[in-house]
Regions:
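Anion (oxyanion) recognition and catalysis
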Residues: 56, 100, 251
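Short amphipathic alpha-helical segments and helix-helix/interface helices
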Residues: 93-100, 157, 179-180, 204-208, ...
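Intrinsic disorder/low-complexity segments
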Residues: 1-29, 33
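Metallo-beta-lactamase
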Residues: 159-228
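Core dinuclear metal-dependent hydrolase active-site scaffold
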Residues: 36-76, 119-183, 259-265
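Active-site environment of divalent metal-dependent phosphoester hydrolases
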Residues: 69-72, 87-91, 113-116, 126-129, ...
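Binuclear metal-ion centers of metallo-dependent hydrolases, dominated by the metallo-beta-lactamase
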Residues: 120-129, 205, 209-265
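Active-site metal-binding motif and surrounding structural segment of the metallo-beta-lactamase
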Residues: 63, 68-114, 183-189, 212-213
Length: 265
């Protein structure tokens, strides 16, 4: 895996010495998040924040759940946007408007229609093709009661077939039969839903083992971090609970577990 720092130019002022330039660069690097970019054949995937992902192939860009809390100055304009759910850190109208190319489809689940009136609704089980990209909508829902609750049929995961690869962005879900039945996955983005106890590590291991993707990225695993922060407050230290447990259980099954830096420190 390679890490890429996309940093802008200093807009004004002259730095007099090499030492000062070095100090200034260090400050800028502390402010700009590292963007982790992996290549799978001709497909390039960049991870941003929580559940925000960029997929590129042959000059086409897919944005999944873009969120303004990420540094979107390093995101590319999208030919296709996929939204998994209607919650603000999945469906961010401002981020969609910023990254959407003119005429680019925005795929939403039915619950996103009020916020994206011109969105393309995909129901669980639907398949659509956008140029050379095929998208299958997979059910994503909760079984255990409690809030927030995701009823069956209101949110999607997506299997994205592009560049000869099958990439499964699972969305917010428990280990339901629809998820467990997906096969032939090259790359999976699989949620933990902590601390809500709806997708604990043991359930995730069971589901991923059945799916048997070649590579899996745990994502969407810190619900405390994404909660709104009061004025003057600070976000909590990101959790890492369950990540090493997944790695220890899945690596012997020839499933590569990659840990991305989803939450800025």
């Amino acid at each position: 895996m390679t890490a890429r720092v996309a940093s802008g130019n200093v807009a004004s002022g002259n730095v007099a010495s090499g030492f000062s330039r070095t100090v200034l660069l260090g400050v800028l690097l502390l402010m700009v998040p590292l963007l982790a970019t992996d290549k799978f054949g001709d497909v390039e995937i960049t991870t941003f924040i929580h559940s925000s992902i960029q997929i590129e192939h042959a000059g086409k860009v897919i944005q999944v759940d873009p969120w303004s809390l990420a540094d979107l100055s390093h995101a590319k304009p999208a030919d296709l946007i996929l939204i998994t759910d209607d919650v603000g850190h999945h469906l961010d109208v401002a981020a969609i408007a910023r990254l959407r190319k003119a005429g680019a489809p925005v795929v939403i689940a039915a619950n996103g229609r009020p916020q994206v009136p011109d969105g393309v609704v995909m129901n669980n089980g639907d398949t659509m093709t956008f140029g050379a990209i095929t998208v299958d909508a997979i059910g994503a829902y909760d079984i255990k009661p409690g809030e927030p609750y995701h009823p069956k049929g209101e949110a999607n995961g997506y299997v994205i077939s592009v560049g000869g690869k099958r990439i499964y962005v699972v969305g917010v879900t428990e280990c339901v039969p629809e998820v467990k039945a997906v096969r032939n996955v090259d790359v999976a983005f699989f949620p933990l839903n902590l601390p809500l106890a709806r997708m604990e590590p043991a359930a995730a291991i069971d589901c991923i083992s059945a799916m048997a993707p070649k590579v899996v990225y745990p994502y969407h695993y810190d619900q405390e971090w994404v909660r709104p922060v009061p004025a003057g407050g600070a976000r909590p230290t990101p959790t890492t609970r369950g990540l090493q447990e997944l790695k220890a259980a899945l690596t012997p099954k020839n499933i590569e577990v990659r840990l991305a830096d989803w939450y800025p420190k």
